[in-house]
Each structure stands twice: as structure tokens, then as C-alpha cells.
């Protein structure tokens, strides 16, 4: 079974002369790690918002484990760490997790248990009572990931998860993501870091100007930077 199926999605913002996504399709098999790459403006963030039901395509559809979005059960399978960090800076780390756990319909006991686990896994246990205003950008990213993991999702959507994270914490995050995947969590990673994509992902979808221009195995590519340049005509500065 596929964890994610996107079928012929077209989406155009009001007033835009060209669609952000044009007849876009892709699939991610259950238990896989898949990277989403493309130049700035390729449609990556739009696609992530469509997957989570924040936007609705003018054509096509999205299903998660066979359930058509935005089905509530399908949404419960998804954990999302978006690029714009969705935390409340006036709350402590633990209070943020308590809030997001309640939004996910978790019981108080579940929230308490999973919060301890998520804080430990993201290296934030000692900062659990610290206010978000004291967190660095990298710490906020890690708390963003902790919130996404709180309800034990089957499909994890990550949009630039390691941006601003220090190298040591980034490696710790990579180890955690590989551990989660080994435990059966499917991961879709949207990143501008090619080394990150190659280290973590077995599959790759490449977008440019709203269209899919490659969809296949990472192992078939070789040098990802050269492949990206050849397919898009653009380099790292355009990511």
C-alpha cells in the first residue's frame, strides 16, 4: 500500500498567470523515505499544504493510506513539521506539546507520556519548562519536530526540518529520523540540503515550475547536485 498518493493535482493562486502545480502526480510507498526537491518557486510548499488539506487543488486529489483527504482519519495519520514554525513563544516547550496533543484529541495521560518521549528524542528534556521566547531557531525546529511526533504519526511530513539546527543536533535529528523509519514511519522530506536528502531518502521527486521532472530511486542518480543542475538548469543558490 502507498502511504501517499497524489493524482493529477493542479493548483493556481488567485491572480497568478501560471499554476503553482500543474497536473502533478506522485506516490510514496508505505515505510519509505522520500525527498522532495526543486528550485525556489517550484511548488514544494504549495504541495505540502495541499497534502495536509490547507489548500485544495482545482483538479485532482490526495489520499493517505487509501483515504481521500481531507478525511479526518487520514489527517490523524499525518505528522507535519512545517517550515513556518507553528509554536506559541509565550508557552513553555511542555505547554506547547500539551496544546498540540489536545488538538490531536489525545488524552492527558497520552500527552504526558508522549511529551516525555518526544522531548527526550529531540534533545529538549532539560528545556521542557523553558519559554519558547528563550529558544534559538534550531531549538524551535526541534520542538516543531517533537510536536509533529506527539501523536505517533504513520506519515511524517518535514519541510526544511534542520534549517538553523547546529551540526551536532542535526546529526542527532538524522539518527532519530532513521530510527523512526526503521520502526515503520513513512517520511516525506522537503529540503534544500542535497546531502540531507541523499543521506536520509531512498526516493526522490524533483519539481520545477509546478511540474514533476523526475520521480525515482535516489540510488539511480549518482551526484545529486550535478543531476539537479542538468534537470533544472539551476544550482544550489536557487534552492
What are these regions (language model features)?
Residues 1-6, 10-23:
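A short, flexible loop at the N-terminus of ABC-type nucleotide-binding domains that lies
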Residues 52:
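Helix-to-loop junction immediately C-terminal to a conserved catalytic motif
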Residues 131-135:
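Conserved ABC ATPase signature
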Amino acid at each position: 500500500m502507498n502511504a501517499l498518493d497524489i493524482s493529477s493535482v493542479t493548483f493556481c493562486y488567485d491572480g497568478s498567470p501560471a499554476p503553482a502545480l500543474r497536473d502533478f502526480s506522485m506516490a510514496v510507498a508505505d515505510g519509505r523515505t522520500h525527498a522532495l526537491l526543486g528550485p525556489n518557486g517550484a511548488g514544494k510548499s504549495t504541495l505540502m499544504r495541499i497534502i495536509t488539506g490547507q489548500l485544495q487543488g482545482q483538479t485532482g486529489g490526495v489520499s493517505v493510506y487509501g483515504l481521500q483527504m481531507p478525511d479526518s482519519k487520514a489527517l490523524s495519520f499525518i505528522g507535519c513539521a512545517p517550515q513556518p514554525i507553528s509554536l506559541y513563544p509565550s508557552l513553555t516547550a511542555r505547554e506547547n506539546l500539551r496544546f498540540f496533543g489536545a488538538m490531536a484529541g489525545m488524552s492527558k495521560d497520552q500527552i504526558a507520556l508522549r511529551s516525555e518521549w518526544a522531548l527526550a528524542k529531540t534533545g529538549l528534556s532539560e528545556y521542557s519548562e523553558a519559554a519558547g521566547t528563550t529558544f534559538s531557531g534550531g531549538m524551535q525546529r526541534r520542538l516543531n519536530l517533537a510536536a509533529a511526533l506527539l501523536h505517533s504519526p504513520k506519515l511524517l511530513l518535514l519541510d526544511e526540518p534542520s534549517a538553523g539546527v547546529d551540526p551536532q543536533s542535526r546529526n542527532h535529528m538524522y539518527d532519530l529520523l532513521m530510527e523512526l523509519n526503521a520502526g515503520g514511519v513513512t517520511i516525506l522530506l522537503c529540503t534544500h540540503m542535497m546531502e540531507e536528502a541523499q543521506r536520509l531518502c531512498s526516493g526522490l521527486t524533483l519539481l520545477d515550475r509546478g511540474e514533476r521532472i523526475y520521480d525515482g530511486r535516489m540510488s539511480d542518480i549518482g551526484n545529486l547536485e550535478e543531476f539537479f543542475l542538468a534537470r533544472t538548469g539551476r544550482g544550489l543558490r536557487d534552492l
